[in-house]
Every structure is written in C-alpha cells, then in structure tokens.
Amino acid sequence: MKKIPSIGVVSLGCPKATVDSERILTQLRAEGYLLVGDYANADVVVVNTCGFIDAAVEESLEAIGEALDENGKVVVTGCLGAREGGDFVRGAHPKVLAVTGPNQAGAVLDAIHAALPPAHDPYTDLVPPQGLRLTPPHYAYLKISEGCNQSCSFCIIPSMRGKLVSRAPDDILREAEALVAGGAKELLVISQDTGAYGVDRKYRTAFHNGRPLKTRITDLCAALGELGVWVRLHYVYPYPHIDELLPLMAEGKILPYLDVPLQHGSPRILKAMRRPAAAEKTLDRILGWRQAVPDLIIRSTFIVGFPGETDADFAELLDFLRAAELDRVGCFAYSAVEGAPANAIAGAVPEPVKEERRAAFMAVQEAISRQRLQRRVGQRQRVLVDAMARGGRVIARSASDAPEIDGVVHLGKAAGLQVGDWVEVAITRADAHDLYGMVVSA
C-alpha cells in the first residue's frame, strides 16, 4: 500500500499568521496529504514564523532549528521569511528546503509539491466546508484584509505583508457562513488595520445572496451580525467612523468590545511613533464611546521605553491610563526591530528603566482592572464554555474576554457542560484578571 505523504506544521505569531496556516493546511488536506502533530511521522515540516520583535525572531529561528534537527526537511514561511528576501533565514539555517513570506500559500504549496508530491484520491472528501482550523471548533479567526497603509516608526509589518488589500465582502461572508455552519459560535475579526477595511477598494459595492453590500467595516459588521454568533473586533484604530459601529453594539449585533492598539499616551511620543491618532482626541473618543455603549469593553496594548521617552512622557502615559480606565491592557518594553525607522531616533532608554516603567505601568493597570471587574460581581452573564480544566473544572469566557489574551470566567465543577456550550452564570467574585461564578442555567 502506498504511503500517504504527511506534513507537520508549526505555527507561530499572531492570529493573522494562524489564518495563513489554516489556509495552507486546508489546501494540503484537499490534496490528500496527511497532517501529523510530531516531527517523527512528518515527511516535511512547515514552520510559519513571526519576525516582529527580537524575541519572536529568536523563537522562530529556534523552531526552524528544532524542526531541522528532528526532521530535516523544512519549509519556512511567514513574516521572518520575508526579511532580506529570505536570505536572513537561509543565513541562519541554510539547509531549509524553501523560504517564503507571509500570505504566500501558493509558494509554500509549490515547495511542498517539489519535495513531496501529493497522492490525491479524487473519490475521498478530505476537507470540511469550513476548511481546516488550528483553533477549537467553537471560535474562529476571520481575516478581512492583508497588509497595512500605516507607517508606524517601530513597525516593519508593511514591508513584510505589504500595503492594505481588503478581501471582497461577499467572499468574507461566505467564509463566515461556512465557519458558523461548522460549529463556530464566535468570529474574531482580524487584520492589520480593521477600521481601514475597504479603503483600497474605494468602498465599492459587492453582492451577497442578491443583496448589495459595501466594502466598509460598518456594512460588513452589520452583515456578520445577522449570523447569530459573537462577532468580536480586533486591531481597530480609533478613527472617527468607528463611531458608526456603536449602534450595532447597542443592538447586540456585534459584541461591545474593541481591541484598540493605542501604544502610548504622550502626544510627543505618539508623533515619534507616527501613530494615526492624538492622545487627547482618543481619550475624548473613548469617553464618547462609553456614553453611547456603557457596557463597552476596550482592550489595548502599549509600548514603554520608546526611544526618547522621558520621565515626563511616561507620567503622561500613566495619566492617560488612569483617565481612560481601559478594561484589558498589554504592555511591552520597547524592542528595536531590524529595519524599523525608530532605530534611528536618539535617546535610547536603558533596559532596566524600560522594565521599571513596564512594571509600574502594569501595577496601575492591575488596580484599574480589579476595580472594573469588581463591578460585575452580582451580575448574570451569558458565557461560552472554553475549556475543561483538571478535576472537571469549567473555564468559560464572557463577551468581555477574547480567547488567549483576556481573562476567563471560572465556574468550578459543573456537570453536563461541554466546550462550546452557552450557559448563564451568576458572577460571585473577581480578582485583577478573572471572574468567578456559578451556573444559573444551561
């Protein structure tokens, strides 16, 4: 009996990279390849890399090295693969079979075909309609565009993923419908710049199921909101037109949740970062959003220790944080990225100072988070069962919590529940990160 060619995949980096990996996996399975979870049984290993910060570069290079040591036949793709046209990876690991950049599934497949021809059986249906996914069945990432038109000084993503290219809205909706039909109860809308969706297409009108649909984020969200699942928006710059999404949140069409990458609160540092929004206008917009949608959850990420950041700049950042009272926040100490314009900015902040500021920042945010979560004690919430922990304990998420990056709702032991179930709970206590509750009705 002829051996079925097998592929192993290591997927690193952000949700956009996860979607790229899922597309590669789906096509490989459609071509008859067997997908395996270990090096020993794989004929070829694909490593989807991240190259955004130094730690991610190191992790990616280590993963490539491990795959080469354990297997020997490795195809590299992703953001790190785009650096220096692939020469950066080849310089570190000259034995890799091929190197491609992000969003290049065709090139990855070509490399795999060359090393390991497919053995396709045309009489076997190998791929479900929703494709193959790396996430659990109850949620899925929905990538609506590729690339970015911003020119932030600390970032090299546009040089890796290119300028903004929005998907056609009817194509997105077909994928969303297939994901929901396949069991997804939550769609996490992602891109590099979600609010800019459609700019490159000049908001042209498409058609889905005979209905006109503009290539605009508001129109797309309204259509997604008709699917009867949670729709959660990530990577949303605070553009003025984001206000148009608030009625959809108030009506329950999409979740009252915005992931807004603010990065800093000092106008001077934001200018040096080349960010597209001023801190004072952003704060006014946040306060306005909360007036319109009181239950709105805002998550964000920030960078401390950016070149030239003074004690006064950092104090402004903390003042902004206290005034904004964001619900979920991540903070990173600035890390120089090869090829980023910020590397030329004078006034590098010493590493110990960066870490001191990061710790001080997170201490302020922890107090804010604890206070905001405490307000939910006594409430009833509909949650989605996310995982079963050791001892039969149930871990769920509320509408306020994105998977992997936000908090969870601990329910203790609850008989009869399964991952992906909806359940109503009463919140009994909170800490700085998570909620705790008991099942009211399933």
Curated annotation (Swiss-Prot):
Binding site for [4Fe-4S] cluster 1: C14, C50, C79
Pfam families found in the cross-reference section: Radical_SAM (PF04055), TRAM_2 (PF18693), UPF0004 (PF00919)
Residues of the Radical SAM core domain: 134-371
Name listed for the protein in its UniProt record: Ribosomal protein uS12 methylthiotransferase RimO
HAMAP family found in the cross-reference section: MTTase_RimO
Domain TRAM: 374-441
Enzyme class: transferase
PANTHER family: RIBOSOMAL PROTEIN S12 METHYLTHIOTRANSFERASE RIMO, RIBOSOMAL PROTEIN US12 METHYLTHIOTRANSFERASE RIMO
UniProt keywords, alphabetically: 4Fe-4S, Cytoplasm, Iron, Iron-sulfur, Metal-binding, S-adenosyl-L-methionine, Transferase
Cofactor note: Binds 2 [4Fe-4S] clusters. One cluster is coordinated with 3 cysteines and an exchangeable S-adenosyl-L-methionine.
Cofactor field: [4Fe-4S] cluster
Molecular-function GO term, any one: aspartic acid methylthiotransferase activity
